[in-house]
Amino acid sequence: MERTIGIDAGGTLTKIAYFNKKKLLTFEKFYSHEQHKIIDWIKNNNGIKQICITGGKSKLLQQLLTGSYKIIELSEFEATLAGVQFILKEEQHTINNFILTNIGTGTSIHYVYNEQYIRAGGTGVGGGTIMGLSKLLTNIDHFEDIIPLTKVGSRKELDITVGDIYGGILSPIDNNLTASNFGKAAITESNNSSSDILATVQGLVGEVVTALSLQFAETKNIEHIIYIGSTLCNNVQLQHIISSYTEYQNKTPIFLQDGGNSGAIGALLHATK
């Protein structure tokens, strides 16, 4: 293994990026609260001498690392943007101005102009919301278990759509748009399945994050919105919710292959440049 690794210690997940013996970019992922597993992995890879670390849990993780490593700190968004720029180049995208929406535990949104960036805002709604509400409503709290269920679940018995409100009357906007997330739960007596509840939770998160991103994009007249974050990893249903809503508003959504690892990639590149 190479001597340098990049770590993005997030609120829920900790991602590690490094170049393997074949010089291929490689990733590891741990739950951030399982810090003993992270430390064990680092210690078991004897060649590691330098660590560039970023993310909200970086200070806590540093306290557990011994003095045998050279530690470099990097601001979270500087690392994320460097990783995003790297992936954009690898995927042959030529986009200079875009909205960058990072769906982690919560969601942060930035304007990016070439290599300059300005924080637009954010929301506490994100991957942590999916996991928290899933735990409260279905007692399922592992993301790997949630995702398959969202694929088979239906939101029809829980969400109120525009069409539900207008009935057969011509509505001013698309009948399929959500008028109220979980609105039917208060007015019906249905026994909803876990898959339906989880699909509806994910719909709520996807629509809130997308609506906020679209508002910022419209304000600055920006066409492209890049959505990244571990919440999107292997989450086809959430990507579909986001892309459909984004395209409905005449904006272009982009999902990067390794977008959830952007922070770790940026940290690695910073230490190896």
From Swiss-Prot:
CC annotations in GO: cytosol
GO BP annotation list: coenzyme A biosynthetic process
Enzyme Commission no: 2.7.1.33
Transferase found in the keyword field: yes
Gene Ontology terms, MF aspect: ATP binding; pantothenate kinase activity
Places the protein is found: Cytoplasm
UniProt pathway annotation: Cofactor biosynthesis; coenzyme A biosynthesis; CoA from (R)-pantothenate: step 1/5
Active site positions: E76
Classification via InterPro entries: ATPase_NBD, Type_II_PanK, Type_II_PanK_bac
Record field: catalytic activity: (R)-pantothenate + ATP = (R)-4'-phosphopantothenate + ADP + H(+)
Keyword ATP-binding: yes
Sequence positions that bind ATP: 8-15, 105, 127-131, 143, 230
Keywords: ATP-binding, Coenzyme A biosynthesis, Cytoplasm, Kinase, Nucleotide-binding, Transferase
Recorded family membership: Belongs to the type II pantothenate kinase family.
Cited function: Catalyzes the phosphorylation of pantothenate (Pan), the first step in CoA biosynthesis.
Summary of subunit composition and partner proteins: Homodimer.
Protein name: Type II pantothenate kinase
